[in-house]
Amino acid sequence: MLQVIKRDGTKVPFDKNKIALAIEKAEHSSTGLYEEGLAQRIADEIEEYATKLQKDMTIYAIEDQVYYKLIEYHNPATARAYEGYKAVQAFKRRQNTTDDDVIGLLDRSNVSVLDENSNKDAAIVSTQRDLIAGEVSKDIARRKLIPTDILEAHDSGAIHFHDMDYIIQPMFNCCLINLEDMLTNGTVINGKKIDTPKSFQVACTVTTQIIAQVASGQYGGQSINGIDRILAPFVRKSYEKILNNVIEEQVETYGMEPNMEKAREIAWKRTRKEVKDGIQTIQYQINTLMTTNGQSPFVTLFMYFKPDYEYAKEAALITEEILRQRIKGVKNEADVYITPAFPKLIYVLDEHNVTPDSPYYYLTELAAQCTAKRMYPDYISAKKMKENYEGNVFSPMGCRSFLSPWKDEKGNYKFDGRFNMGVVSLNLPQIGILARGSEEKYFEILDKRLELAEKALLLRYNLLKDVVSDVSPIHWQHGAIARLKKGEKIGRFLTGGYATISLGYIGIYEATRLITGESNTGEKGRVFAMKIMDRLNDAINLWHDKHNLGFGLYGTPAESLTNRFSSLDRARFGVIEDITDKGYYTNSYHVNVREEINVFDKFNFESEFQKKSTGGCISYAEIPNMTNNIPAVLTMIQYIYDHISYAEFNTKSDYCHECGFDGEIKVNENNEWECPRCHNTNRDKLTVIRRTCGYLGENFWNEGRTKEIKDRVMHI
């Protein structure tokens, strides 16, 4: 009887069906090519060869036979997929795979990890510790948790399994903190009970403590859905407390009858000072805190209140102070005010603040000044957002991940206290390369990739569904997400659409160029791009019905992925003009960064894609220094309100510590950041703030993202 010698030297009976099954797996993989009957034909031929050989074959010899026969039968795609599968399996059998990666972090030679996140300073030991833990965690996940076909697809650049360095722990991606409940009903931090704050200053301090705790228990961004509205009652509390103190001073210190008019005037002035101090506390705390993730908390402050709100006056004061503090900036080590990366600010445009005759237009004017100087705030149009989200206006989680509308048992929409389980992204340009100009072939391959993405996303859900609340008390027991008991499972919060789980995508522009020969802004290109978006939406809708999970379509930020996908495809397919030669792929549905288009046409074009990318989207315009032309900024802001749900403006805000230059630091021919005055290229002596992909980065970027930033053209 024929026998096969396994890797450990043991022998098992020869089974040609196992050979055929392995070949079929490679054919049906993300990078293989199925040919009916081929697997069985090759298995039969190998069995015939082994019979003639009249001796046992090693597993290695069989694998070599499979590879060469696939080449012989003109199926190199499956041959490569088979080799990739073998490599992944070999990797999983290894016991120690992280030494080189960890040492590379310590000696700063592991560039791919060091530059992966532009808000993590890898020179700092606390950040290094997080990155080292990430490499070890990623290694365990690759060898023990992630199925081989998903891992092979990830390694080949067919898909990207985001945040692989966190999945061995029961953590989710991003959320909307239920801050209002935590401040109103109290919370617990590190086992210490925190009661309802009695003043605005204390509320601000508690808020930053909550933000830090939440950031350490998840790996993505967090947002406060209406920071002005939520903190406004505490301004009133401070005012009333201060007013009583002023009256007491009038009577007891100055021996006078209470003068209520004067007392109110003094109390309001002191309250404004407390609001200023409180907002300053939030801004400085967020930018100086270091979480267990090795970076400042990635937090978004969403500014939105309605004019008939009981505390509208106080909410407006908070919004005003947030904007004034951001315009001022924070000091760097050279004692110069610079643009802070966090918190991200979002300002909602609505009827009460968008026209010159509206009561809160002065806040919009202040927001325009802030944008011109500090890039934030970004803008959401209440009018356009309501069209896409069943009449609701709410914050994205982090920079762009949006929840789907969801109603509680009473039929009320709920957004605060909800979250996203994670992301898997598709490489749309790679499909275009493989399709070789055929639209039919493109969608055939896309459907196969979607099957893989579905499986990968379900893995994320399955890793969380049996988790108990004890893993992160701030989230699950003390109000950020829920108020469960110790030991209670979180599973019910994952299903029914309460939480979202995201199918990401990158490179609509490149995919369209490969299939239609034109940009996604062209007539044919736009039609094809929309077909892709429709197919992706069809998939998530099908999965939602099938699994009862809140799948969403998400325009991937792709901070490092833009470089990773492009580099993998260039290595595999060579240099392809306008595709792999750039060093990056274009984010999500965006217009190519090099394409000449004005801000109004760009927003108008991309607004149609936002309607289809409701699980995550944002559009931007590159503008010059407009601090002396605020009316033009206001004109563009008005256009956002009328035409697009969510948009932002990118300006330049840099500083050279060598010569004191304050202006735009550019990328030179060597892809290095260089001061135009003294030509300093030492990254340790440059502060460069750029929009990375929805938020600001300040610790530099990988090679691909740097090239993308360099290529950006102005839209005005």
Model-found features: residue ranges?
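Short, solvent-exposed positions on alpha-helices
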Residues: 37, 57-60, 499, 523, ...
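Charged, amphipathic alpha-helical regulatory modules used
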Residues: 1-109, 710-715
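Amphipathic, well-packed alpha-helical segments that form the structural scaffold of globular domains
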Residues: 24, 47, 454, 458, ...
